[in-house]
C-alpha cells in the first residue's frame, strides 16, 4: 500500500508480512478459504520472525506476547463473538482475527513445541515438497510429524482443530511478604 511507503520503518512488519506471502500464499496456498490461517497466520508469524531477526529475541517475545494478548482479549469479539478453531473458520470470518492472530500464536507455539532446529528444517522441507500446491492443516501436520519424528496429532487436535484458547487459573501463591512471585508455565512435548 502506498501509505506504507513513507521513508520510515513504521510499516516494516507490514512489508515482512506481504513478502512472506511469496512462501505462504504463493509457493504454497491454502486449499480452501477455511484454511486461510495457512496463508495469513504464517504471514503474521513471519512478521514476528522478521522482528526477531532484525531486533533480537526479546523483541520477538514482545511481539508474540502482544499478539497473544490481542487474541485473548479481542479475537472472539472481532469475529462476531465466536471462538473458532483456526482450521475450518467460516468463510464470513476468513480474514478475521482468528485466522491472522490466533493462527500466528499457534505457529509460534508449534515452533516452541518442536524446537527451532526441527521446526525450521521441517518447515523448509515442507515448503519445498509442496511447492505450487494447495495445502491443508492435515497435510502440514502429517509432513511435520514424519519429518520431525514427533507425533503432532494431539498438538493439532488441541491447537488447530479445537476452538478457544488454553485457560490457566492460579488459586493461591501464598504469602509473599512483599516479594514478587513469578510463575512459569511450560508446555512439554
What residue ranges belong to the model's regions?
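Hydrophobic alpha-helical and helix-loop surface patches within well-folded domains
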Residues: 1-188
Amino acid at each position: 500500500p502506498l501509505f506504507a511507503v513513507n521513508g520510515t520503518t513504521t510499516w516494516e512488519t507490514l512489508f515482512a508480512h506481504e513478502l512472506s506471502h511469496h512462501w505462504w500464499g504463493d509457493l504454497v496456498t491454502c486449499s480452501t478459504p477455511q484454511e486461510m490461517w495457512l496463508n495469513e497466520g504464517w504471514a503474521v508469524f513471519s512478521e514476528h520472525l522478521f522482528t526477531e531477526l532484525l531486533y533480537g529475541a526479546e523483541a520477538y517475545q514482545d511481539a508474540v506476547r502482544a499478539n497473544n494478548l490481542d487474541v485473548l482479549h479481542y479475537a472472539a469479539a472481532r469475529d462476531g463473538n465466536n471462538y473458532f478453531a483456526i482450521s475450518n473458520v467460516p468463510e464470513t470470518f476468513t480474514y478475521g482475527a482468528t485466522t491472522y492472530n490466533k493462527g500466528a500464536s499457534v505457529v509460534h507455539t508449534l515452533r516452541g513445541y518442536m524446537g527451532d532446529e526441527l521446526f525450521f528444517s521441517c518447515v523448509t522441507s515442507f515448503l519445498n515438497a509442496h511447492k505450487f500446491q494447495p495445502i491443508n492443516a492435515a497435510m502440514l501436520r502429517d509432513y511435520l510429524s514424519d519429518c520431525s519424528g514427533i507425533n503432532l496429532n494431539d498438538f493439532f487436535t488441541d491447537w488447530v482443530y479445537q476452538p478457544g484458547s488454553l485457560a490457566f487459573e492460579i488459586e493461591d501463591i501464598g504469602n509473599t511478604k512483599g516479594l514478587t512471585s513469578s510463575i512459569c508455565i511450560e508446555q512439554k512435548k
